[in-house]
Amino acid sequence: MLTADDKKLIQATWDKVQGHQEDFGAEALQRMFITYPPTKTYFPHFDLSPGSDQVRGHGKKVVNALGNAVKSMDNLSQALSELSNLHAYNLRVDPVNFKLLSQCFQVVLAVHLGKEYTPEVHAAFDKFLSAVAAVLAEKYR
């Protein structure tokens, strides 16, 4: 459960993500594809080369969805219901992949935010992204 302090840290950090959604998202996806190659199987129709328009476009979608989740931290289930349905019923993405992408996104945040990505921010984002992953996996039960 996110505390009031967690929510403040997440919101303040998210303000620094604004304007970089496409870059951060593409970088997180590229890290995931390199670190966890089996994740590429969910993107057979994509050009997965670094900097491809498809990876950048999907990265932007992912980070924008996270932005919507930040705005709806108190009601993630409702905010992410459509995405949960899409990934569970249409795309049939193994839910473990949400955690893998979360890890990669946290690395991107740490790289770009440097000292501003404090242990407290890391802990808050870890809780937040775990909650997002859990909500996205709800429809699999």
UniProtKB/Swiss-Prot annotation:
Domain of life of the source: Eukaryota
One cellular-component annotation, GO: hemoglobin complex
Molecular-function GO term, any one: haptoglobin binding
Gene Ontology biological-process annotations: hydrogen peroxide catabolic process
Annotated tissue distribution: Red blood cells.
Start and end residues of each Globin domain: 1-141
InterPro entries in UniProt: Globin, Globin-like_sf, Globin/Proto, Hemoglobin_a-typ, Hemoglobin_oxygen_transport
Hydrolase is among the record's keywords: no
Subunit structure: Heterotetramer of two alpha-D chains and two beta chains.
Function: Involved in oxygen transport from the lung to the various peripheral tissues.
Official protein name in the record: Hemoglobin subunit alpha-D
Organism, scientific name: Aegypius monachus (Cinereous vulture)
Lineage, top ranks: Eukaryota, Metazoa, Chordata, Craniata, Vertebrata
Gene for this chain: HBAD
